[in-house]
Amino acid sequence: MNWAISNLTGGNRVSRAILVRYSSVPLADATNDGSSTAPQTPTASTPRPSSSHSSLSSTFAATFLHASSRHIPGRAVPRQNANGQNGGKGNASGAGGGAGGGGAGGASGGTGGTGAQAAGQLSLPLDVEETVTCFCRKARRKERDGDQNSTDTKLYLEESVLERKLPEADLKALVDLPAGLDYNEWLASHTLALFEHVNLVYGTISEFCTQSGCADMTGPGNRTYLWFDEKGKKTRVAAPQYIDYVMTFTQKTVSDESIFPTKYANEFPGSFESIARKILRLQFHVIAHLYAAHFREIALLGLHTHLNLTFAHLTALHRRFNLIDEKETDVLRDLEVALRLTDDTGGCQDATSTTSSVHDHSHSGDLQHQSLQQQQQHHNSSSNSTSSAEAFHVNSQSNNGSTSASASVSLIDGDAVAPPICTQPEAGAGCKPAGSSGLLGGILGDLTSGEFGDTTRYCTSAVPQAAAAAGAGVGGTAIGATDAAALNNGAGALHLNFSNNNNNNHNLNHHHHHHHHHGHHGHHHAAQQQQQHSGLIQCNAAGGGGNATGVATGGATAAASSTTTA
């Protein structure tokens, strides 16, 4: 058996790849002068003249197609008779070609009868198995690549690559809204930072993310992401194209002055939070694709810690302000658990740790009670109520008659009486005590809880005017929380820092904001000596007039919380 490769068109790669098996196929060849020769069987040792290449190809094609039609199942095959009817037809056509000039057509017609008789000797002109293998080689290679990627989808859960640079406490402090800072301003800074980090990590492995290797934008668990164009039409695009759309849209959005303002006179639009949610959701899609399809390359480059930290940053921000739908983040929930960003049940770990902290502090109740009595004697406080109070700080403890309550995310009612006047979400405390009056600019914020769920209530702490006047009298020293309890404040205040600077709480130092949106300037009002003081109040409200012990800080802390002058 000999093997030959048919070259039907000369430029068709698929045609050259068809393997033909034959035993003795009579092929007509032509010499340089155009005269026909006797049919010969080509072998590996018989070279073919280059001048007769086209004639040989056409003759072999005719013989190959005629012979192959006899072996295709289900097709009617014309029966050969003794008179050689098929050969006669070939002779008739060959005669016409010979009358025109006696070229290769005549030679083909002259040998038509012999070719028809020799066609019966063709055993199997088309090896189906080899041809199918040739055609499907590329598809099988792609299938093997897909199987390899599917086995590596959980590579990011290996213990050796579960590394990140910051512990949980630092991540929590990273996303907590600073007191006095606008919520949109804080959200804009984190959105810009996450966009830059995701773009940098993807840029390191972008050459591995190709149209052929990543034909679809996929995530863990065979999650597929479709792109929605400006008209809302779903489009199935490759991963590189999808990520290019994401980065282009994000860059165009953050560069828009009307959406991300950088000048003092410009304000954030009312729909800014929804725009930021969309940007963060698209960035999460890119992170999910990096974990699902390119984590091996990222780990080999030693960039897995950076990717884990970026994911932890986005997850902490989402858990703090509830920015992404849970259906989107479910694909990487196992990674959240592995990185200890959340527990298996999806509950709030901070509330549990806060509750245990309250029980631990109850063992030292006698010592704290003595300190409380000393502070009451020093400030002449007369409040001895037995109402319940919520203790969240390490130095906060109620009296012997009060009952400690654990933190709960369902304490705030959506129909609370107190109106929202600040931008700090609060889910672990009441909104406003009944007997409070003379509101300052203090922000009530539970910095020990990171879960808010769907709660969007905003609360403020209340400090009576008498407490503010007492703060002015001591000249910048901190006031203990017992004063607030004695004056019907009703809040377990922590870190009360007051100063005599009167800048209307307008220019707080934005140290946490590296993108200088809305740089505020201080305004002097020296002529008006008001009794209004700026300060940072970070506490948890408590019902009634329960006594709570606060940590008094003075001097440097009070100066740090004061406003700056131009």
UniProtKB/Swiss-Prot annotation:
Subcellular localization is given as: Cytoplasm; Nucleus
In residue numbers, the region (Disordered) covers 28-57, 74-118, 346-407, 498-541
UniProt biased composition (Low complexity): 35-57, 367-388, 498-507
Q: Does the keyword Acyltransferase apply?
A: no
In its UniProt record, a GO molecular function of this protein is: protein kinase binding
Q: Where is the composition biased (Basic residues)?
A: 508-526
Spell out the Pfam families in the cross-references: Mob1_phocein (PF03637)
**What GO cellular-component annotations does this UniProt entry give?**
cell hair; cell periphery; cytoplasm; nucleus; plasma membrane; rhabdomere
| The organism's place on the tree of life at top rank | Eukaryota
Record keywords: Cytoplasm, Metal-binding, Nucleus, Zinc
**Compositional bias (Polar residues) spans?**
394-407
Ranges of Gly residues compositional bias? 85-115
A biological process from GO: negative regulation of synaptic assembly at neuromuscular junction
| Residue sites binding Zn(2+) per the record | 209, 214, 289, 294
Task: Name the job this protein performs.
Answer: Required for the normal morphogenesis of a variety of polarized outgrowths including epidermal hairs, bristles, arista laterals, and dendrites.
Family label: Belongs to the MOB1/phocein family.
Quaternary structure and partners: Interacts with and activates trc, also interacts with wts.
What this protein is called in its record is: MOB kinase activator-like 2
Organism this protein belongs to: Drosophila melanogaster
User: What gene, per UniProt, encodes this protein?
Assistant: Mob2
